[in-house]
Amino acid sequence: LYQNEEVRQKNMPLLKRCNDDPTIAFMTFKPYFHNESFPFIEERTQEYFGCGRISRQDADKFAANTLHIYEYFVAPVFKRGLFLGFDQRSREKIGEPYGWIRTARDQREVSQQDFYKHCEIVLQPTDTTENWPRVGFEAMASGSVLVVDNRGGWRQMVEHGKTGWLCSNERDFIYYASKMACEPNLRDDMAEAARARG
């Protein structure tokens, strides 16, 4: 039983070599998500452009170039970042976040709902391949546009250019984050499309 088709296709041949019994069925399932826990946020402050990333406390959940990406994307107003799930291991990997990026260890410091209320975009480069990321469901329900890696479960969850952005390299992350900061009408349209898809 697999969470997404890409992982099923990758692992099925390997497992069939271990046991080629034709009665074994390799299946995927449609996960359940409780949308009411993450209400859609139509209006966010215009005083700054809110961006962030959220995960459990694990250094691998951060790409080594995370701070470079956050620093170099442009916005017409001040940027305000929020890293939820940030601890000493994360700091040792990526360095000390800039003064405009707030860090929180876990949801006791900043709730998930407050995180999404802050974020126009979830700018989430990682060094892991996500299988079927819960963050995607939460962001899409909340109206935070996803700017994520072009691999793993993100490919099935995000429709590139319509419900979010799939990034293959550092330049993609910087470009699409900048695009979302500078094109609020497109960002709003994408947030609505993601909400409908989710």
Residue ranges and their predicted role:
Residues E5-V110:
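Conserved catalytic-core segment of nucleotide-activated headgroup transferases in glycan assembly
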Residues Q113, G136-A141, R155-Q156, K162:
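Short alpha-helical segment that forms part of, or immediately flanks, the ligand-binding pocket
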Residues T129-P133, M140, N150:
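Short glycine/acidic-rich beta->alpha loop that forms part of the nucleotide-sugar donor binding site
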Residues E120, G143:
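A short alpha->beta transition loop at the rim of the catalytic pocket in nucleotide-sugar-dependent
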Residues H160-R171, K179-P184:
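Conserved acidic donor-binding segment of nucleotide-sugar-dependent glycosyltransferases
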Residues V145-V148:
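Short hydrophobic beta-strand element within catalytic cores of glycosyltransferases
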Residues D114-C119:
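Short alpha-helical donor nucleotide-sugar binding micro-motif in glycosyltransferases
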Residues L186-G198:
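A short, well-ordered alpha-helix in the C-terminal region of glycosyltransferases
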